[in-house]
């Protein structure tokens, strides 16, 4: 039973109501920015849950590192370069090239500059292995991109989870209409508000409720002559029974949740690769430092040979060309030293780019190298470990499951459409601003079934075939990934053996070169300048190759651990060693002479 409707609202009251509705709408819009904080907190929780699910709690991006410096505006500003961005590309005639004046270089001055050493700037920041990785985690562009890629996957999951949560919508439509009533033209001011709530059902379908409220004022010569208000409440239910029924309805949500796990694996796999890349670059710098130090020692040895030969020439005991041979070799080595120092400076700048350090600031690379013992390798067990533990292979395996599910979903789309629906309306005709009485008798309702016969399902059947072909592709890609992993594990094992073999050979070469040098020093008159310079060169070459072999052994061990899925890295730049692996370092000057087993600082 509906109460009689009476309207007591004057024109000023109607305008106040309209203003109130608009103020509420603007207030809701102003709260949007605050919701971004909640989104970040929710995304961080999803990231932590995903990283915990793969037992890598340290593998969580820092959201404060991924905050955008540009917050955006609701409307894009117009500018002259909006449609055609400007390009700066002067012609050859507009360029100015300043040629350097030709002048004779002072060779002695160049030699002094090349062979002299200068201390690093006092404000230069010092880096060791762990500090390099810690800094790279915070500042590296490469690491930041990987974090943001992981974060984007979490944001996609938030979207899907929100779609599957209760959703409320409210649309307010104020409008002015020209209407004709009994051949008389009049103007109507109308305010329509539609408030609805929707909820997806877990196995397909949706339930929703909506309230549609309308208020109209008929205006004639700027005077309200009548008012009409109405409200309608509707309930709707739709449930698919064949096509679209079952877990196929949740496909996007299921895939987003699985993608979150894939993202966690991919980010952790990137961290391990990035760790090796940073350590490899760092060890390269340490090796180059050692090579430069060895070359400087070579220059000093050659300098003493040149001085001796010059003295012999002056005393008449040696012909001049023999002394010139020694001088020529010394000049070649000095030139090589200049090249090595330039290569080192470039490598340092590239290392700064790798870890995100400012390239115009000086840094000091501390002489430090890992000293891991080579593992005992069982080829079959190593490959089996890689198949079981490698994160990328686990993702490739799970993508086969995804492809099979897509075939099932494509099969579901071929079925007939059979949807059960039910609707109910609760009508009323009150002034909803002053009170609402609804008709709760549910006399307006409908229940039925919508059937879509599968007459033309050619496109859907083609999609089934496409899904089957894609499944075969993904399955073959998984097999190929396994075979590739087996090859990589074998190659990593051989790399360790080859590096150890090279290291042992260079130890022998150093002993031989030193014995040769000692023999020459014991009987200097029996050796020619060429013999002396060759002995110096061979000792330098052996020491350089040993430094490279030391680096190669450590990187090969790290790569083997990664290829077999055994590498674990903490956020402080340290290896989380499994039982049986002791993490040690070589530190300070004279890395080649240090025995193995220096404990971490």
Task: Locate the predicted segments by residue.
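Amphipathic alpha-helical coiled-coil scaffold segments and their short linker/junction regions
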Residues: 136, 198, 318-327, 331, ...
């Amino acid at each position: 039973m509906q109460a009689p409707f009476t309207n007591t609202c004057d024109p000023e009251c109607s305008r106040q109501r309209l203003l109130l509705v608009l103020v509420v709408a603007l207030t809701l819009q102003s709260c949007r920015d605050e919701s971004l904080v909640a989104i970040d907190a929710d995304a961080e929780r999803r990231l932590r849950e995903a990283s915990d699910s793969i037992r890598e709690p340290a593998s969580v991006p820092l959201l404060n590192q991924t905050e955008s410096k540009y917050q955006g505006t609701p409307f894009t500003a117009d500018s002259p370069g909006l449609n055609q961005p400007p390009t700066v590309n002067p012609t050859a005639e507009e360029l100015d090239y300043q040629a350097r004046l030709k002048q004779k270089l002072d060779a002695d001055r160049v030699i002094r500059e090349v062979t002299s050493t200068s201390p690093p700037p006092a404000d230069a920041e010092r880096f060791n292995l762990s500090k390099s990785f810690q800094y790279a985690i915070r500042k590296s562009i490469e690491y930041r991109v990987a974090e943001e890629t992981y974060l984007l996957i979490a944001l996609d999951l938030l979207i899907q989870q929100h779609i599957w949560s209760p959703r409320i919508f409210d649309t307010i439509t104020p409008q002015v209409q020209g209407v004709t009533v009994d051949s008389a033209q009049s103007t109507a001011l109308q305010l329509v508000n539609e408030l609805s709530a929707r909820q997806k059902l877990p196995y397909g379908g949706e339930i929703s409720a909506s309230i549609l409220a309308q208020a109209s004022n008929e205006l004639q010569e700027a005077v309200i002559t009548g008012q009409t208000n109405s409200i309608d409440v509707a309930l709707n239910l739709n449930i698919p029974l064949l096509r679209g029924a079952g877990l196929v309805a949740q496909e996007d949500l299921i895939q987003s949740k699985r993608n979150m796990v894939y993202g966690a694996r991919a980010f952790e796999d990137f961290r391990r690769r990035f760790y090796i890349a940073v350590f490899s670059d760092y060890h390269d710098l340490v090796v180059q430092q050692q090579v430069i130090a060895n070359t400087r020692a070579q220059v000093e040895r050659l300098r003493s040979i040149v001085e001796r030969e010059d003295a012999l020439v002056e005393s008449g005991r040696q012909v001049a060309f023999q002394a010139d041979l020694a001088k020529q070799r010394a000049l070649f080595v000095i030139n090589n030293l200049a090249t090595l120092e330039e290569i080192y400076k470039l490598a340092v700048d590239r290392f700064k780019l790798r870890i995100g350090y400012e390239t115009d600031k000086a840094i000091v690379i501390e002489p430090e190298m890992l000293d891991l013992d080579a593992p005992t390798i069982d080829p079959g067990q190593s490959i089996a470990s890689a198949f079981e533990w490698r994160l990328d292979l686990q993702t490739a395996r799970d993508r086969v499951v995804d492809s099979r599910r897509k075939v099932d979903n494509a099969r579901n789309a071929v079925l007939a459409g059979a949807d059960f629906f039910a609707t109910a309306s609760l009508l009323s005709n009150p002034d909803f601003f002053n009170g609402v009485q609804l008709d709760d008798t549910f006399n307006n309702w409908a229940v039925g079934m919508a059937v879509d016969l599968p007459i033309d399902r050619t496109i859907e059947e083609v999609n089934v075939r496409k899904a089957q072909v894609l499944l075969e592709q993904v399955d073959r890609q998984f097999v190929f990934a396994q075979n590739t992993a087996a090859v990589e594990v074998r190659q990593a094992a051989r790399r360790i053996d080859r590096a150890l073999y090279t290291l042992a050979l260079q130890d022998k070469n150093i002993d031989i070169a030193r014995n040769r040098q000692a023999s020459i020093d014991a009987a200097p008159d029996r050796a020619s300048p060429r013999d002396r310079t060759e002995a110096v060169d061979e000792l330098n070459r052996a020491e350089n190759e040993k430094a490279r072999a030391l680096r190669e052994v450590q990187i090969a061990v790290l790569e083997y651990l990664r290829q077999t899925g055994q590498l674990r890295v903490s956020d402080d730049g340290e290896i989380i060693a499994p039982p049986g692996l002791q993490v040690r370092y070589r530190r300070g000057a004279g890395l080649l002479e240090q025995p193995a087993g220096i404990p971490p600082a």
